[in-house]
């Protein structure tokens, strides 16, 4: 009996030694393979040009700022740029291939062919009804017109900021604005907005709620109207709903992938609604040239500096989506 027990113990010890030997052999073989593989990589590394996709981001809580790829000089290699211009520019240039010429010039600034899109619009009013800002970066050219300063200012306020909007049922409800960021935005072929402020008894202040002719006109036959009234006061509204849509909107902050370039004019338009603050000129720029070729040449020269004050975003803006944050 004791002989059998000794034999069992001896067999177990021999097996343990054998397994330990196998494990050490496998470990030495793996070490040999790994070290040989690393040696090959080290020897070949100087001769291989690879793409480094690493990005050093500052800890700011924001991913909106564009950063240059560490192994390429084309900062905006994978970005798209939309350039919006009045149709009169194309009419003056009178060259069917002028956009191709500009595309080649943008290529010299690091923008590959096909990454820059040119979109014309008839006038400020028509562009206000259907703004379409789909590119990573959007630059809107507005030719200064002294008679359209307010229209230009409202359009700039719309496209340079993000708005969270909800429908308004003016036939059933009264509405009030809560703070300076709260505005009523109307869009359509013809928007006439009338308001009647109400007291705590819902009686009109300086107007009669049953007589729309006594309401105050705050917008008349406009295609885009941003209405600001006294905060904290209920209002009854009258809107030309057959040709216009009105929304209750809250300004969330800047739409940082859009810039407006004013062509001509003595000063950059101020789109700040609050009269006690300094004029808002961020991403509002001005170019003073008489000829459109000179305007576009200047934009090509400064395109990368212009884009540096913007931030690449994935959200787009169009005539329907502007009502909601997209």
Curated annotation (Swiss-Prot):
List S-S links within the chain.
82-135, 165-249, 191-244, 196-207
Organism's domain of life?
Viruses
Q: What is its main location?
A: virion
GO molecular function terms here? metal ion binding
**Which compartments is it annotated to reside in?**
Virion; Host endoplasmic reticulum lumen
The GO cellular component terms are:
host cell endoplasmic reticulum lumen; T=13 icosahedral viral capsid; viral outer capsid
Keyword line: Calcium, Capsid protein, Disulfide bond, Glycoprotein, Host endoplasmic reticulum, Host-virus interaction, Metal-binding, Outer capsid protein, Signal, T=13 icosahedral capsid protein, Virion
Q: Which residues bind Ca(2+) 2?
A: 177, 228-229, 231, 301
Q: Which residues form the signal peptide?
A: 1-50
Positions glycosylated per UniProt: 69
Q: Where is this region: GPR motif?
A: 253-255
Q: Write out the ranges of the annotated region (LVD motif).
A: 237-239
Pfam families referenced in this protein's UniProt entry, alphabetically: VP7
Q: Which residues bind Ca(2+) 1?
A: 95, 206, 214, 216
Subunit field text: Homotrimer; disulfide-linked. 2 Ca(2+) ions bound at each subunit interface in the trimer hold the trimer together. Interacts with the intermediate capsid protein VP6. Interacts with the outer capsid protein VP5*.
Name recorded for this polypeptide: Outer capsid glycoprotein VP7
Q: Which organism is it from?
A: Rotavirus A (isolate RVA/Pig/Venezuela/A46/1985/G5P13[13])
What does the organism's lineage look like at the top? Viruses, Riboviria, Orthornavirae, Duplornaviricota, Resentoviricetes
């Amino acid at each position: 009996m004791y002989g059998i027990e000794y034999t069992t113990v001896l067999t177990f010890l021999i097996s343990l030694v054998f397994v330990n030997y196998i494990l050490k052999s496998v470990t030495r073989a793996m070490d040999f393979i790994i070290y040989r593989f690393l040696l090959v990589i080290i020897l070949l590394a100087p001769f291989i040009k690879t793409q480094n996709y690493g990005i050093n981001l500052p800890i700011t809580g924001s991913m909106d700022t564009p950063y240059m790829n560490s192994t390429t000089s084309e900062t905006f290699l994978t970005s798209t740029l939309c350039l919006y211009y009045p149709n009169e520019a194309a009419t003056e240039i009178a060259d069917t291939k002028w956009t191709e010429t500009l595309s080649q010039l943008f290529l010299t600034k690091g923008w590959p062919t096909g990454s820059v899109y040119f979109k014309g619009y008839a006038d400020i009013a028509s562009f206000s009804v259907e703004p379409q800002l789909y590119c990573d970066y959007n630059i809107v050219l507005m030719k200064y017109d002294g008679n359209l300063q307010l229209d230009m200012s409202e359009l700039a306020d719309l496209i340079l900021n993000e708005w969270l909007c909800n429908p308004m049922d003016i036939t059933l409800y009264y509405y009030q604005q809560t703070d300076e960021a709260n505005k009523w935005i109307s869009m359509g072929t013809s928007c006439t907005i009338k308001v009647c402020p109400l007291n705590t008894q819902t009686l009109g202040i300086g107007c009669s709620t049953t007589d729309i002719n006594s309401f105050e006109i705050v917008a008349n036959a406009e295609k885009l109207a941003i209405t600001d009234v006294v905060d904290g006061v209920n209002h009854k509204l009258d809107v030309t709903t057959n040709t216009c849509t009105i929304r209750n909107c809250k300004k969330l902050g800047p739409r940082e992938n859009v810039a407006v370039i004013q062509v001509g004019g003595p000063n950059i338009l101020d789109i700040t609604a609050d009269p006690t603050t300094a004029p808002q000129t961020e991403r509002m720029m001005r170019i003073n040239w008489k000829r459109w070729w000179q305007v576009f040449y200047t934009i090509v020269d400064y395109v990368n500096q212009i884009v540096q004050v913007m931030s690449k975003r994935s959200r787009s803006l169009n005539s329907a989506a502007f009502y909601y944050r997209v």
